[in-house]
From Swiss-Prot:
GO molecular function: GTP binding; GTP cyclohydrolase II activity; zinc ion binding
Protein name: GTP cyclohydrolase-2
Disulfide links within the chain: none
Record lineage: Bacteria, Pseudomonadati, Pseudomonadota, Gammaproteobacteria, Enterobacterales
Origin species: Buchnera aphidicola subsp. Baizongia pistaciae (strain Bp)
Quaternary context: Homodimer.
rRNA-binding in keyword set: no
Segment forming the signal sequence: none
Amino acid sequence: MKLTKISEAKLPTSFGEFLMIVFEESKTDKNHIALVYGDIKDTNNSVLSRIHSECLTGDALFSIRCDCGFQLKSALMEIVKEGSGILIYHRQEGRNIGLSNKIRAYALQDIGLDTVEANHHLGFSADERDFSVCIDIFNTLNIKKIKLLTNNPSKVTVLNNAGIQITERISLIVGRNAKNSKYLNTKAHKMGHFLPIEY
């Protein structure tokens, strides 16, 4: 087990009331969050699930150069609409290169590099994330079957390989605009994300 459950409390939001569970990752001391809505204890049902990687600029500062904030809001709304589900807030900012390096990558994108080229220029792979803590959270909460809100094929592969049964992948295509269209096209072209390519 790579993480420990630390605390939990009710979290009223503008979408509905969630149970917020905080976990601490032993390797990094980072706190990861599970937002649980409704009853997810019936192991016969597939739980509507979203792994949302931390994006301070999109989630909290309303940046439109990515689709993260739009996806966070949409995922919470879909979970409430479903009647139950879970959103794991995965504390690996900037595909796990950290906030400072993400802003460095933004500066490189401002002069013409795409999101993958910028990461490589800084010495990182296109995606540095490790989803093992998310798998631990699913296992801790005894979630074995899920309907996954994602456009990312890597998440599907990692979870399937870990024994989490994905009964359905649900696209989350929201928030495209003139400021992030190139970024989204790059994720489709170079990272294989299930996204429409638009110019």
